[in-house]
Amino acid sequence: VTMFEGDTVRVYSTFANPNVFGEYLLLLIPVTAALFLTEKKSKYRRALWGVSLILSAASVVFTQSRGCWVGIIVAAALFITFYEGRVWTAAPLLVLALFLVMPDTVFTRLSSIGNTSDTSTAYRIYIWLGTLDMLKYYFLGGVGLGEGAFGIAYPYFSYSGIDAPHSHSTYLQLVSDGGIPALLAFSALTLSFFKNVTFSYGVGGKRSFYSVMSLALGAGMLGFAVEGFFDYTFYNYRVAAIFFLYVGFSSAIRHMTGGGQDE
């Protein structure tokens, strides 16, 4: 646990950084929700998934990570829409309930998104601007892989007093590491992932295990992609590992549902 801007508590578990912990949870929560919703055989396992889901959701709130909050909102919106879209008819009541139960610090943090007078927001914007200036010269092949290469090139383009180990954006960091080809390769991998989960969704009925899990994977990946605009989501190897597990699971589920037979 750490303190942020006065008396605001931010949790980070074993990840040393609240944003990294939030990204980890952002990928786990949709899958946990799918396991909870599809568990029909054991009430104990269902209860376990339910408790895990509640604790994970609470932990995301206390990371105070605005990018992860936006990612979770996007992931939840996609999941709810395709799992049970009728829930949106009760949206006003849900919003009211959130206002009643959420701490004021959550709404204060959310309202600061895009506010350049906020220290954290301004810090990121200046890093992005410095990185973009750098990439004007290195967009074809990047500056090299890793923090070491970034740390050598970035200071020549950084704004005064704005030091950073990375670009605080997955997409800018990909171009920094390997240029436009790296960004294109990542885009192709992501599109392949969404192709897999789109195929698997609805196989065996929209409430089948494979369908719900494919929906959860797609929702989690979309939320993760949104968070990638605000931070470098592959900075921690554990988060990166879960991303590639997502990709592997999407391919495995498509194969098990018959999608690999004509490829």
Please tell me what each predicted stretch does.
Residues 35, 90-91, 109-110, 141-144, ...:
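Short, hydrophobic secondary-structure boundary micro-motifs
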Residues 93, 206, 215-263:
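Transmembrane alpha-helices of multi-pass inner-membrane enzymes
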Residues 5-9, 106, 114-129, 133, ...:
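Long extracytoplasmic/lumenal interhelical loops at the membrane interface
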Residues 1-7, 13-82, 90-97, 101, ...:
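Alpha-helical transmembrane segments of multi-pass inner-membrane proteins
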Residues 13, 17-19, 57-59, 129-132, ...:
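A conserved mid-to-late transmembrane alpha helix and its immediate loop/hinge
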Residues 199-211:
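Membrane-interfacial, low-structure loops and terminal tails that flank and connect transmembrane helices
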Residues 2, 6, 16-19, 64, ...:
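Residues at secondary-structure transition points
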